[in-house]
């Protein structure tokens, strides 16, 4: 029997990485928020790899932090190892990767939720979304509890009709054998949402004592304690020193490994027809790699620790859903793992997702006001992509409570904007992974300047609190002082110390006066050389120095990208009226008309990015809108 169990402003269903960020954001912005999860013991659980970051993903974590989110803080606090990737390339693709303690991460995030004002946590299984007059009115649990709210955020991850597959064995379940939400998919279909089916997987876990590490190559962390959070007081490694980091280990499969897989490929669910869902392109299973890259004799695998006090090793690169007995053979064929003890077998999981073309850029379902979806439910892969969507959905649900306009991040403002724009306008045919190559303005969207790009916007909506804002203002002031210092410092060509420093890095001698800024523009000159010449720079934080240096070195390229952004902004400003009827526009292609109706773009810029809409369609649409404007049927924008 259904009964009223409570009234809230925002209800979040699912406490994975998306749900946690959504609930915390909504509560921190003043919304009375309820977070419902299948299990209090699995909040923010890392069901797959025990790490965060890497190219584009690390950028996202920094953007989440810059806006006032939680992921970066929790990742720093519970880190096992830190590495800055791509340091041999340009700053646009420098990316932090943090190895995390799975259990510690879960506990730290749960404590953040339990300690958050305006946020209530509850364990239950949601089976229905209730609506009234076409708008969301709340959710109903399996036990009949009705929680009323005008805003509901679904962040159910891979739990919608989840099905675990290990060889010939298949059963209903979520990740790691958790219960799954079998009825919610049907409820969403009844609301008119179109769902799809995807697949993902995870590798086996082995006992660390059973590895012969002499046959692996150690992968230590960096000596610099890199952080995700821009908060200068953020601690790391559970309070341990940087030299106490736990290493990862690099190994390789062998021709024997590949032969075992090839001999049993008929038993692989991926090839036997047992798996219906489409899997992630950028994280293929080992059996898929062996088939697709048959000419390669080996593939890399990494043994990654899962915690300070855990005996489990995650086998990155060895994702599989082969039968369990074949998994033993595969593992034991790898040098150093001849006696490996299998703790958990790898598996594949199929699940339902919401096709994201049905969403607005605020992640609200267009046809059901007050209903938001975020995370893997929207067809993405990865903790970071999920958390970023959750943050945005939580922000917009809170703003809706306040009667304010949605918070939209443009492609030129952040990887978060690239992610959402791609999902809504291009859709997904496979689990979506964010890549630096998907961003047009990579040099603007660096990981080091995420706070300069987004923290002021987080402050405007009330998510960035006073302590973070003060740290941001201090960094901005430091950058201004650094710029003034090296612009105002001039060196004589007779300066012997200057000549010595230049010779040390094979930089050409100067023949006239030269400023610190001009020196910094030289490719071979780094912050280290400038600090030798201007000792006062040693007083400043390394992050502020790095930021100021990049802005000078790449000034020309940055100016070009800013000009491109300004030109494209004019298209973004050309609004498309909500009442437009695409069936009345002659000259549109059949596919273009269909896609424009599905996505309902808010402006011409968005329309140009919709898959299936051609340049000819855009020209037709522009002419139509101009004719309507001149006829007085559309207001000029």
UniProtKB/Swiss-Prot annotation:
GO biological process, one term: tRNA wobble uridine modification
PROSITE patterns for this protein: GIDA_1, GIDA_2
Cysteine disulfide partners in this protein: none
Pfam families the record matches: GIDA, GIDA_C_1st, SAM_GIDA_C
Binding site for FAD: 14-19
Gene3D superfamilies assigned: FAD/NAD(P)-binding domain (3.50.50.60), GidA associated domain, C-terminal subdomain (1.10.150.570), tRNA uridine 5-carboxymethylaminomethyl modification enzyme MnmG/GidA (1.10.10.1800)
GO molecular function: flavin adenine dinucleotide binding
Keyword ATP-binding in record: no
Location relative to the cell: Cytoplasm
GO cellular component, one term: cytosol
Cofactor: FAD
HAMAP family referenced in this protein's UniProt entry, alphabetically: MnmG_GidA (MF_00129)
Biological function: NAD-binding protein involved in the addition of a carboxymethylaminomethyl (cmnm) group at the wobble position (U34) of certain tRNAs, forming tRNA-cmnm(5)s(2)U34.
Family from the record: Belongs to the MnmG family.
The name this protein goes by in its record: tRNA uridine 5-carboxymethylaminomethyl modification enzyme MnmG
Source lineage: Bacteria, Bacillati, Bacillota, Clostridia, Eubacteriales
């Amino acid at each position: 029997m259904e009964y009223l169990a409570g009234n809230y402003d925002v209800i979040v269903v699912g406490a994975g990485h998306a749900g946690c960020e959504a609930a915390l954001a909504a509560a921190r912005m003043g919304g009375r928020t309820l977070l419902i999860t299948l299990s209090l013991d699995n909040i923010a659980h890392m069901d797959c790899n025990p790490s965060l970051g890497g190219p584009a993903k690390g950028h996202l974590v920094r953007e989440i932090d810059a806006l006032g989110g939680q992921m970066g803080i929790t990742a720093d606090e519970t880190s096992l190892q830190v590495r800055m990737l791509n340091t041999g390339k340009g700053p646009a693709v420098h990316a932090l990767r943090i190895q995390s303690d799975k259990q510690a991460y879960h506990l730290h995030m749960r404590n953040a939720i339990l300690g958050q004002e305006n946020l209530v946590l509850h364990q239950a299984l949601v089976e229905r979304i209730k609506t009234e007059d076409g708008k969301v009115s709340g959710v109903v649990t399996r036990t009949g509890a009705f929680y009323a709210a005008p805003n509901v955020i679904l962040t159910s991850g891979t739990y919608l009709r989840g099905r675990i597959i290990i060889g010939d064995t298949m059963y209903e379940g979520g990740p790691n054998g958790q219960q799954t939400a079998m009825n919610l998919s049907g409820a969403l279909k009844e609301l008119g949402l179109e769902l799809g089916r995807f697949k993902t997987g995870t590798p086996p876990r082995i006992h660390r004592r059973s590895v012969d590490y002499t046959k692996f190559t150690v992968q230590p962390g960096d000596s610099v304690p890199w952080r995700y959070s821009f908060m200068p007081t953020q601690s790391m490694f559970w309070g341990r020193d940087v030299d106490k980091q736990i290493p990862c280990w690099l190994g390789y499969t062998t021709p024997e490994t590949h032969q075992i897989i090839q001999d049993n490929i008929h038993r692989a669910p991926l090839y036997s027809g047992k798996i219906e869902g489409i899997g992630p392109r950028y994280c293929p299973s080992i059996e898929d790699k062996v088939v697709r890259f048959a000419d390669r004799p080996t593939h890399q695998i990494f043994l990654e620790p899962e915690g300070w006090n855990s005996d489990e090793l995650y086998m990155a690169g060895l994702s599989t859903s082969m039968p369990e007995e074949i998994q033993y053979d595969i593992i034991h064929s790898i040098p150093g793992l001849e006696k490996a003890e299998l703790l958990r077998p790898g598996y594949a999981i199929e699940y339902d997702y919401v096709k994201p073309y049905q969403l607005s850029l605020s992640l609200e379902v267009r046809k059901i006001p007050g209903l938001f979806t975020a995370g893997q439910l929207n067809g993405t892969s990865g903790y970071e992509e999920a958390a970023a969507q959750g943050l945005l959905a939580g922000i917009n649900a809170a703003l809706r409570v306040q009667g304010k306009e949605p918070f939209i991040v443009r492609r030129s403002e952040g990887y978060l904007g690239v992610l959402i724009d791609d999902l809504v306008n291009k859709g997904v045919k496979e689990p979506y992974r964010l890549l630096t190559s998907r961003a047009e303005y990579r040099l603007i969207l660096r990981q080091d300047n995420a706070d300069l790009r987004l923290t002021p916007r987080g402050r405007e909506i009330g998510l960035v609190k006073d302590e973070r804002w003060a740290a941001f203002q201090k960094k901005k002031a430091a950058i201004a002082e650094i710029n003034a210092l090296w612009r105002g410092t001039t060196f004589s060509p007779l300066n012997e110390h200057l000549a010595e420093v230049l010779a040390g890095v094979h930089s050409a001698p100067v023949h006239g006066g030269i400023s610190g800024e001009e020196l910094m523009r030289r490719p071979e000159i780094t912050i280290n050389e400038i600090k030798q010449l201007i000792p006062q720079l040693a007083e400043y934080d390394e992050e502020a120095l790095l930021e100021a240096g990049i802005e000078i070195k790449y000034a020309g390229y940055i100016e070009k990208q800013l000009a491109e952004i300004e030109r494209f902004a004019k298209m973004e400003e050309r609004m498309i009226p909500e009442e437009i009827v695409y069936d009345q526009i002659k000259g549109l292609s059949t596919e273009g008309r269909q896609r424009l109706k599905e996505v309902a773009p808010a402006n011409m810029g968005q329309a140009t990015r919709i898959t299936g809409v051609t340049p000819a369609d855009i020209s037709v649409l522009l002419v139509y809108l101009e004719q309507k404007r001149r006829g007085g049927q559309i207001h000029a924008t």
